Each structure stands twice: as structure tokens, then as C-alpha cells.
């Protein structure tokens, strides 16, 4: 099943929220959370740019 761009954006935002919650639970690993969140931000920005 192929997902629409809007579905992918929604899933990425859900993953980001999960990562943030995980970072709060495990502060020693917050650098991993920050790195993953930044990569997801770049992906979201790319989706937004290609949507226009």
C-alpha cells in the first residue's frame, strides 16, 4: 500500500513526539534523540519543499 505524502508527514511527526518522550525518560541518550529529531526535521522540510 502506497502512502500519501500527508500520511508520511503525520507519521514522521508522531515519531518525533515519541523520540522527545524517549529523550525525557532517558536523558543520558538525549544526544541520540536530538540527532534523530534533526534528521526528521530535514525530511519534513524536504516534504514541504516538494509539496509546493
Swiss-Prot record:
Q: What are the disulphide bonds in this sequence? A: none
* InterPro entries linked: HLH_DNA-bd_sf, Spo0E-like, Spo0E-like_sf
GO MF term set = protein dimerization activity
GO BP, one example? regulation of sporulation
Q: State the source organism's domain of life.
A: Bacteria
Q: What is the official name of this protein in its record?
A: Uncharacterized protein BH0262
Q: What is the lineage of its organism?
A: Bacteria, Bacillati, Bacillota, Bacilli, Bacillales
